[in-house]
Amino acid sequence: MIKRSVQLLILGMIGLASSVLNSAGNTDELSDFEHSFNTIQESSTPEEPFQPLKAGDYDQAYDYYIQGYYLKAFREALRRAEKNDPFAQTLLARIYMEGCAVPVDGARAALWFERAAKQGEPQAQLRYGLMLFDGNFVKQNQELGEQFIRKSVNAGVKEAYFYYGQLLLYKASQEKQTLPGVSSQSRENEAIEQALKWHLKGAALGDAEAAFAAAKILSLGTLNRPKDERNARKLLEVAAQNNHLKAQLHLAQWLIQGRGGEKDFDRAFHLLLHNATHMVAPAQISLARLYRDGIGTKGDTIMAAAWYLLAKEAKMQAPDLEIMLQGMDNTQREKAQKEAIKLLPVF
């Protein structure tokens, strides 16, 4: 009996051990099963090191920016800028300058432009160089500013050609004031020639400011180059097509006068009308004269007066149009005032 009890005890212990082993196996399986439902998994591989963008890479922050999602653009740019991405630093500086999503802060913009510029980002080099040259938000250092601007020119930034040309003209004018004489006049003439060269390069890349600046130099001529109104008009066309306001106003006058090419009253009228409807007072004055004289449109004194009244609201006056107003009777003036109200933009 005792022998049988011992055998049962041994068998029971063996069964318990087997049960424990099976239970342990089941526990491991259960643990694996539960782990498979855990949505927060432990990372199997370490996080990849941050890689700044290269030229041509897709830029999520800039994509947000051009779509108008400025806060998202700011956050994404800040995340990358803090990790020393020069493209993100440049965009962040731009956002601070424009006040998109955050208050305008020129000092912070200068800080980020500086960081990006020192890493060789061409757009930042231009903007930081201009800040240094003018002393805006940073201590003025024209020599260092010129170096950064020249670097952006060498990198092919199209806007940089205009600024570098203007920089040369500025330096020559300053030298003329401090050291008047034949030598300074000679250097000024040389600076104009050099500025024209840089402006023409910028114009060839489609920069409106460079095209307009080159047009002005060509319309006057230089010491070594006679005035060239035909090519000046072509450059005005380039600038005007790129929405350069002054170029559009100048081109309209040239089209009326026939400078640099044939007269085109109809085109001049529509150029001025486009800007006048956007409340550009000089365009309103010029358009008033076209209505008064019947150039490019049917003569209409009432409409001429209406456009001039709008220009007067912007504190601009023209003696010849004042005489026109004085020659109108009360009925005509009332009609002109009503037409002027109709011309106001609706927001």
Feature-to-residue mapping (PLM):
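TPR/TPR-like (Sel1-like) alpha-helical repeat modules
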Residues: 150, 298-316, 341-345
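Terminal, low-structured helical/coil segments at or just beyond the last alpha-helical repeat
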Residues: 31-37, 46, 312-347
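N-terminal leader/linker segments that initiate helical-solenoid repeat arrays
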Residues: 20-83, 87-90
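Hydrophobic face of amphipathic alpha-helices that form TPR/SEL1-like repeat modules
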Residues: 57-63, 91-98, 127-134, 165-176, ...
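Structural signature of tandem alpha-helical TPR/SEL1-like repeats
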Residues: 67-72, 103-112, 139-148, 174-198, ...
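Short helix-capping/linker turns of helical repeat alpha-solenoids
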Residues: 50-53, 57, 68-69, 82-86, ...
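Eukaryotic tandem repeat interaction scaffolds
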Residues: 196, 203-282
